[in-house]
Amino acid sequence: MYDCIFCKIINKELPSYKVYEDDLVLAFLDINPLTVGHTLVIPKEHSESLLNMDDKFNERVLKVCKKISNALKRINSSIYGGINIYSALGAGAGQEVFHTHFHVIPRFKNDGFGFKRGNKLNLEVEKFKELSMQISMNI
């Protein structure tokens, strides 16, 4: 058994504000939301990140993210412009709970949350070619 807060929620050892559950996936409201309606979607089987999650969960987790997104848009007409869906993979990317999870974050006008793009890297064409080849060869 993992000493994992999300596993404890799955096993009903800790409470949650559940919005969806099926045999593979659980979705519940984030108790430290970035915006109103911020929801977490998790596989019921423990894995530390998307990179080592069993493939049988991939399709289901994304389908549930879509269901939650559509539900949020139906119940809140003030959602402005869209919804962010993301997963941080590793501490360097901001992952704090090491159980695979996706954030479904409704966006509101002037909500103060967002991904800010920094300076452009200004890579040369050859560097783009080299990088695309390296990635392709490692898939």
Swiss-Prot record:
<protein>
    <recommendedName>
        <fullName>Uncharacterized HIT-like protein BB_0379</fullName>
    </recommendedName>
</protein>
<dbReference type="InterPro" id="IPR019808">
    <property type="entry name" value="Histidine_triad_CS"/>
</dbReference>
<dbReference type="InterPro" id="IPR036265">
    <property type="entry name" value="HIT-like_sf"/>
</dbReference>
<feature type="short sequence motif" description="Histidine triad motif">
    <location>
        <begin position="99"/>
        <end position="103"/>
    </location>
</feature>
<dbReference type="Pfam" id="PF01230">
    <property type="entry name" value="HIT"/>
</dbReference>
<dbReference type="InterPro" id="IPR039384">
    <property type="entry name" value="HINT"/>
</dbReference>
<dbReference type="InterPro" id="IPR001310">
    <property type="entry name" value="Histidine_triad_HIT"/>
</dbReference>
<dbReference type="GO" id="GO:0003824">
    <property type="term" value="F:catalytic activity"/>
</dbReference>
<feature type="domain" description="HIT">
    <location>
        <begin position="5"/>
        <end position="114"/>
    </location>
</feature>
<dbReference type="InterPro" id="IPR011146">
    <property type="entry name" value="HIT-like"/>
</dbReference>
<dbReference type="GO" id="GO:0009117">
    <property type="term" value="P:nucleotide metabolic process"/>
</dbReference>
